[in-house]
Amino acid sequence: MVSGNDQQVIEYTSVLKEFSDGVDLMELKENFLYIRTREKIEAKLIWAGEWEWKPVNETNENNLERGRQYPSANSALMENSPEFAKWFHGQLFNRLCVLGSTSSSRKDML
């Protein structure tokens, strides 16, 4: 069985691998991902069973107020960064094109 801490590491590692190319900076900190979007928006992306997007407040870094909740990391990034959304849709389009060309070549072989 995966413990809560292990699951957190799995979630953060997955997001880093999948989405770090879509932002200016993504770093794993002690218990959150530090994000800087291409629009220079800085935030903490925190996983605790669901994703929380918490803008970094330079005047009060220890602010305990909860951020906005999201069902997935990519939905948090897409809603808060138009540049990430463009990148993500481009990635999706490329994958669909590859799948389309793969299925076409399979039909040709039949």
Swiss-Prot record:
<dbReference type="GO" id="GO:0005829">
    <property type="term" value="C:cytosol"/>
</dbReference>
<protein>
    <recommendedName>
        <fullName>Uncharacterized protein C4B4.12c</fullName>
    </recommendedName>
</protein>
<dbReference type="GO" id="GO:0005634">
    <property type="term" value="C:nucleus"/>
</dbReference>
